[in-house]
Design a protein with these regions (language model features):
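Short, structured coil segments at secondary-structure junctions
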Residues: 58, 64, 72, 172-175, ...
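Structural detector of well-ordered beta-strand residues that form the stable sheet scaffold
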Residues: 41, 69, 109, 180, ...
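Asp-based phosphoryl-transfer active-site loop
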Residues: 3-18
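Mg2+-dependent phosphoryl-transfer enzymes with acidic/Ser/Thr/Gly-rich catalytic loops
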Residues: 2-6, 23, 188-272
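Short, hinge-like loop/turn segments at secondary-structure boundaries
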Residues: 57-61, 85-87, 125-129, 196-198, ...
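Residue-level signal for inorganic ion chemistry
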Residues: 33, 72, 153, 227, ...
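Active-site phosphate-binding/coordination module
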Residues: 24-124
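Conserved acidic, metal-coordinating active-site core of Asp-based
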Residues: 100, 104-217
Length: 272
């Protein structure tokens, strides 16, 4: 078996079932890994505030020696909330993205820690339906300021018009920012070189763990970087094709069939 010291887990479509549950088998498997001293790190696009329930389910909430990577790698923090590393947008970045989404007739939400600033637009954002635990504040763009922290931006919109609009994004923006879909109806905008792999690289440097000792599990485009980077990259059976293409392992089952539990049992817990 690989000498895995850290397991990085995406949430939606990976660790969680479609109805957003952690099954008993999955929780037991993660506990068995933690009992062996293996770090279990939720690695997500969400802010820490939206993770409280799941960290509580895992028994790692509020712990000084447990860690979470949020905002797709933009924030590396202890589960106490203490920040180890942070990369954010400038106000000018948000202004440029707002200009682009207005041109494409798309909504844009700017996220500042646990608060989502929903910039008023002709198109309604669907982001509140994805993360009801967050605080949503409707604003005009003029209400935003350079004194605010902007962790990332999102565009949550109906899949068909969103996919069509993505094809029209100004090409230079792909050189300036990280732009990727994390769900069918969710496009994420992050600072350049902020993705899950960079967040994990910063965390393992802090912990003294080698890249080869990391197992990463995911299913969507925002998981691709960490699955390609990790010593053991695991794609769910339900993963998008580009993620499966870079994975070391593709599970024979989906997230609804406890694929993460299977992968940990097979590649971490199983005795030789």
């Amino acid at each position: 078996m690989a000498d895995i010291k850290l397991i990085a887990l995406d949430l939606d479509g990976t660790l969680l079932t479609t109805d957003k549950r952690l099954t008993d088998r999955t929780k037991a498997t993660l506990k068995a890994a933690r009992d062996r001293g293996i770090k279990v790190v939720l690695t997500t696009g969400r802010p820490l505030k939206a993770m409280d329930f799941f960290l509580h389910e895992l028994g790692t909430d509020g712990q000084d020696d447990e860690y979470t990577i949020t905002f797709n790698g933009g924030l590396v923090q202890k589960n106490t909330g203490e920040i180890l590393d942070k990369t954010v947008f400038s106000y000018d970045d948000v202004a440029r993205l707002y200009e682009e989404t207005e041109k494409l007739s798309l909504p844009l939400d700017a996220i500042s820690e646990g608060t989502v600033y929903q910039i008023q637009s002709d198109q309604e954002s669907l982001y509140a339906k994805f993360n009801p635990a967050l605080t949503f504040v409707p604003v005009d763009f003029a209400d935003l300021s350079s004194q605010m922290t902007y962790n990332k931006c999102v565009t949550a919109f109906a899949q068909e018009p969103l996919d069509a609009a993505i094809q029209k994004i100004s090409p230079e923006l792909f050189d300036q920012y990280e732009i990727f879909k994390s769900r069918e109806m969710l496009l994420e905008w992050s600072p350049k070189n902020v993705h899950k792999a960079t967040g994990l690289a910063k965390l393992i440097s802090h912990l003294g763990i080698d890249q080869s000792q990391v197992m990463a599990c995911g299913d969507e485009a925002n998981d691709l970087s960490m699955i390609e980077w990790a010593g053991l990259g695991v794609a769910m059976q339900n993963a998008v094709p580009e993620v499966k293409a870079v994975a070391n392992v593709v599970t024979p089952m989906t997230n609804d069939e406890e694929a993460v539990a299977w992968a940990i049992e097979e590649y971490v817990l199983k005795e030789n």
